[in-house]
Amino acid sequence: MLRISVRHRNAAIALGTTATAVAVGSMYADKRNVSMEKKIPTPVNIGKKTIPSRADQLLKLSKGDQYDVLVIGGGATGCGAALDAQMRGLNTALIERGDFASETSGRSTKLIWAGIRYIATGFAALLRFRNLTRPIDALSDFKGEFKMVLGAHKERRILLDNNPHLTNWVPIAVPMKTWTIWPAPMGHPLFSIMPLVLPAVFKFYDSLCGFTCPPSHLMSSSRARRKFPQLEEDVKYVSVFYEGQHNDARTATCIGLTAAEEGATVANHTEMIGTIHENGDSGKVIGIKVRDNLSGKEFDVYAKAIIFAGGPFTDGLRKMEQPDCKAAVAGAAGSHIVLPGYYAPDGMGLLDMNTSDGRFLFFLPWQGSTLVGTTDRKEDAVSSPQPPEDEIKWLLSEAEKYLSPDLKVRRSDVLSAWQGYRPLARDPHAPPG
């Protein structure tokens, strides 16, 4: 692994785990009531800063000067780490082999999701019979999930407050066709009564952010059919809750540009192709070899601390420095499709909490159309992947579950589709599989 000074190693650890929301501003969470009509505050003139051109950035990057921090990867995490480092007074550089947010950070479901599924799965795991024999461990596991969800609520609030031009609240309706569900969602009998307790669950979800989100509420079947004429007639009621929504690629790109505005050296289409060691191959890493993918020019960049922020591609970066290292990241592929806007009328999304394979499936209003996703499949990440046709067909099939029989979702309705990879931590010492 990279050997660096204690001071810079600690900085790298802290920066590598910086959340996107922290990177874009102050740790301030407003406790006022939130309405759907967000007012964008009048900008304060604090002096215009000019972002250097890419050519100027590359010229600065190739001079051979040593940076305090060098970030590899221009997604949300990498851009956030670069901005955080630069704002802490560290001389920082960032490179991205493609365009900013062109991989994972631009291929999401566009939600600032606070983790309602984690709450549900946490309760399901806590109440499983086998955990009765290990109550302390079970409570500890649930506490970890709960703390993560609380943190997600806090970061969602910060991201919404700091980026009103890129974010909004989106209402999401959960239609219920029966008063009980069997087989039970998530494989736990308790969840068979989910339709009866769902409104209370959403109120609990509201409470986790101090009720600073628009309030969850019920919608009668008659009102639901007026708002969603395409719904099946046997829907008993609809429960509505709110999540944050944002333009993921623009959010990450704006963070990267803000880092450049604050003085960081930032360059896209610039790829790491090797490492530079202090005393041959046995010495510590003091820099990397870089290629400008537009001109083909190669040069060296030196840094005291290097952060790999390649998401699902991080193992590829690690192997340049340590060829025999074991995989630490697992890729989880997810496909999305975009349908015409009439599948999400009146700016309201839909959530299926009981798909045929037990996952959550969202139907979300997005730029005048309807975004549907996501699937989940474990596989090694590849750049710019194409969504498999069988997953597109599965999404279309699931989309019909709550729709009127008169409305058929056709393959020709798909306006666009994409696939992205979520990076999941993997124990390098665990056995294969």
State each model region's role:
Residues 2-69, 84-88:
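Extreme N-terminal leader/targeting segments of oxidoreductases
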Residues 6-9, 32-40, 176-263, 267, ...:
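Flavin (FAD/FMN) cofactor-binding and adjacent substrate-gating region
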Residues 110-227:
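Dinucleotide-binding Rossmann-like beta1-alpha1 core, especially the glycine-rich loop
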